[in-house]
Amino acid sequence: MKLVKESRDAMCRSGSQMIKCVRSFTNNNFLDLYYKEISKSNTPATHPVVTAVCSSILGIEKEKAAMMLLYGFTVSTIGAALRLGLVDHIQSQQILHKLKPNITSTIEKFMSIPLENMWQFSPQYDLVQMTHEQKFSKMFIT
């Protein structure tokens, strides 16, 4: 199953920027090979995969890499709500603080699941994204 095009593109732009950044201060043959394959369009630069590869190369434990990814996603989502005026700065920090245990428990629950048992299933989110793709005016670049 593929993500909605707009989400896929945004995820790949983010991953591309991350790998360019890490390559700027790290010399690693595997990272260079991976970057070349991305550049030739042989593989996408999806942000979660690039995060995993870069984290491994930088010696970051997979649990900490997962924490970075989920925490970053959470901050990004709360930041969007803040920009839309749905919450204020204090509320956004309160929400983030309340979600920390959920982030930790999610990582603990799913960290050891084999790759073949992972998939995406969020039909309501997909429908919202598909509708968003067709809109003329957008508040955020995705």
Over which residues does each language-model region extend?
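Context-gated lysine
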Residues: K2-K5, K20, K36, K40, ...
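C-terminal auxiliary extensions adjacent to catalytic cores
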Residues: G72-T142
